[in-house]
Amino acid sequence: MSELLNRRLSLLGANLPLLKQCLHGIERECLRVTDEGRLAQTPHPEALGSALTNEQITTDYSESLLEFITPALADPAKVLESLEETHRFVYSKLGDEYLWSPSMPCTLPAEEDIPIAEYGSSNIGKLKHVYRKGLALRYGRTMQCIAGIHYNFSLPEALWPLLREAEGSTENDRDYQSSAYIALIRNFRRYSWLLMYLFGASPALDKGFLRGRPHQLEELDAETLFLPYATSLRMSDLGYQSNAQAGLTPCYNNLASYTDSLRKAVGTPYPPYVEIGTHVDGEWVQLNTNILQIENEYYSNIRPKRVTYTGERPIQALTSRGVQYVEVRCLDINPFLPVGIDLTEARFLDAFLLFCALEDSPQLDNGECGQCTSNFLTVVKEGRRPGLELHRNGQPISLKDWASELIGRIRQLANLLDQAQGSDEHAKALDAQQAKVDDTSLTPSAQVLARMTEHDESFVQFSLRQSRVHAETFREQPLSNEKQQAFETLARESLARQSELEQNEVGDFDLFVGAYQASILAISS
């Protein structure tokens, strides 16, 4: 254990109540499917409100890809309760459709028949739609149908000044906090392979997903492709490469270098996109011809975040007010869990992220950056391979040894969290993960393959069965009238807000896009 972590643990031990002020939020994406396990071609249900203005129920890429968003709360149990209630409400409005249980998609229609999400006729609604048309053009619609869990986490705001003072930092509070979150992200890059081993749940996929493209996967049956030791094919390259983003590798050495690299990417034309242009036959097909249309197009496993004001762009918020929380984006949906994640996973994530934040986090040089990427990709493709070795400081080390050692180091944070909350829940969550390290058959990825083999099911058959099991769970536990009414009010109010936006819209869409592009160039370095 580093001396820095020791000192920080002592400081936390003397300020235990602070640890009850960490905030958590979850975003869960999931496809709407028919009772045959095919993509639902119906519009976003009006009974769920406006996908543009409902803050709890929206759509991601496709009209058929729902996204549920919880509030940020201090108690992860309450966050999961909120997510569960959203699922129960949605099921009361879904008719004979289902929410798809895993991350990898159901049987998809032809590429051009995957519906892109619609957000109405306001300028901001049209901007969101054109952005998604650009994603289709650049990466294909099929790729955009993969779903995941995003876990948002922040440390208590009151902790940063204490740490800054104890360490005699010359940075102001805001910059110290941003530097600390970027340090968390560097450690996350070092250790996130562990999350893929423990929580990866996508070792197989529907054959049609690859659209006949060449791949290195094996056949499990006539309809299913897999890799025998894979943990998360969702997070592997799957033969897709974004050449445009290939040169975009911010190694998170400070906030300024991160925002600068993103600002350059949203302002630098990419020749193949320039060749297509922003319009085809007079219709918008992408917002611009730059490497990234907007910041959120940058694909990463974790993002530094700051809540934005209306009309503000993510880079503007980060540059002016610093980092407020991190968004973990590499978590698979666990198809065995009704909402795709449970409290045990959340408790482990809290201890893991706290460890990443407080452990010493030197700058990443190119060699270590490459090693982090390589370890991550090795684990997603063959994390359960017996005797698998990763690389640490350029030296080989067995995954099992390193995982056990890491869990041992994270345990100190789990113990502090338990002391703060007067429980042993975090320690138990760590025990459950250590058991998976000791026995690979306990990992979700192994369990998925075991169930499919046991029931002689294809990926789609297994997934549909799980989706039906969860649907029954939710439908058997309807919300109280009061809760149901609250969701229905949210939905109605969101539709009214969208309608108001559309009625009060002034200004031409082309000018709106121009102003939106210009806003990024106005940010000074």
Curated annotation (Swiss-Prot):
Belongs to the glutamate--cysteine ligase type 1 family. Type 1 subfamily. GO terms for molecular function: ATP binding; glutamate-cysteine ligase activity; metal ion binding. It catalyses: L-cysteine + L-glutamate + ATP = gamma-L-glutamyl-L-cysteine + ADP + phosphate + H(+). Disulfide bonds: none annotated. Keywords: ATP-binding, Glutathione biosynthesis, Ligase, Nucleotide-binding. The gene is gshA. Gene3D superfamilies: 3.30.590.20. This is Glutamate--cysteine ligase. The keyword Nucleotide-binding applies. Pathway: Sulfur metabolism; glutathione biosynthesis; glutathione from L-cysteine and L-glutamate: step 1/2. One of its GO terms (cellular component) is cytosol. Its EC number is 6.3.2.2. The lineage of its organism: Bacteria, Pseudomonadati, Pseudomonadota, Gammaproteobacteria, Pseudomonadales. It comes from the Bacteria. InterPro entries: Gln_synth/guanido_kin_cat_dom (IPR014746), Glu_cys_ligase (IPR007370), Glut_cys_ligase (IPR006334). It is an enzyme of class 6 (ligase). One of its GO terms (biological process) is glutathione biosynthetic process. The keyword Glycoprotein does not apply.
